[in-house]
Amino acid sequence: MSKSKLDLDFFKKEVFMAPKTVAIIMDGNGRWAKQRGLPRTAGHKKGADTIRTVALAAQDMGIQKLILYAFSTENWKRPEDEVSYLCKLPGLFFNKFINELMEKNIRVTFAGELEKFPQATQDVINKAVNMSKNNTGLELCLAINYGSRREMLLGMKKYADEVVQGKRENDLTEEEFSKYLFVPEDIDLMIRTSGELRISNYLL
């Protein structure tokens, strides 16, 4: 087997218990491109295409939910041309791979504030979500325009509004608060593809 392919033999053994929820920080794409004398956008495209490989491998391993940190709230500070390309990537990815994801019974969801993206990108993502909503395999969740501090702030505001409006009592617990988050589940395994040891405002 070539090094470019994932060897899943170990994960198929009975002794391996797959984590239920895995989160991946997709970074290092720009550095990958620079090392090869390519524009940063080439690195981002390579990273997006890799989503397919990772999602199919996660499905084979028995992972229930895969959350990919694809676009953070801090990414808006990058150069305008790079941001423009990053905003187009979800559309390029789903137009290329949505049929295969459907065949593999993979369900697409997203975490974050989609409204800031161009309408065309929103439409493609929402189409993928709606097309796959009845699938029962791996949940592939894209964290886009996502930041954990922002997630908690929005959750607290929503909870406070409901208390003020008399929709609920002021009796918040950790378990209840998780329902106000984009990602309510506990993360069993987090991976940062560049190897750096920081979480960059992701799923705090």
Placement of each model-derived feature along the sequence:
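Flexible, compositionally biased loop and terminal segments
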Residues: M1-L204
